[in-house]
Amino acid sequence: MFLLAFFIISLIEIIAEYCEDKLVIWMTKPLILPFLILYYLKRSKKISGFFVVALLFSWIANLMFIQNTFHYIFYGVVFFLIYRILVIYIIVSKAQMPNSFPLILGSIPFISLYVIVTLYTYTILGNSVYLFMVQGIFTIFLGGFSLVNYVLTFNRQNALLLISTMFMAFNQFIFLLKYYYEQANILQAVAMILFILGQFLLTRYMITTEKDKHKYDFLIK
């Protein structure tokens, strides 16, 4: 029920982004992540309080992004950065940390993409480029971490994590590149598709890795 509501509302929101209907966006976007949180709380065998808090930070960031002004976007990026840090903490607590050399190799594709996007958007970002670069460091680390773990240990959990990370990384790139195109509504709709799929797959990763029967243990060991 919660998952169905999540996807139906997400579909309506994506269409609203394409049609640039601000009223429908305001009616639907604030509901997307709450339904995903409810789905997670219902399906998880060991609820992670950190993950719920991370999704709440992502939810606040999404509300900030609706305004589409530099001031709100800046604070939205800050909240999303906190979300990213919490997600990395959770994942590193669950998965085995690879050695430095494989991690660096796995990070190269993500480093390349970030360098290219930064060069294209530097003039638009201005001083905010430093905040974008900080967020980029965490995204690059998570991307390299996910890719190496997937290559070294091929299983469903690592596949979910890798695909989710790639979707979220490309979502950030499109979010910036839309400022270079007149038809930004198309890119915004694509960015939302990637965001929704990325969040859903990350939630599935959390559910898949939580096998403990103590459903309301909020500690991450």
Regions found by a protein language model. Give the residues of each.
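Polytopic alpha-helical membrane-helix bundles and their juxtamembrane interface segments
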Residues: 1-221
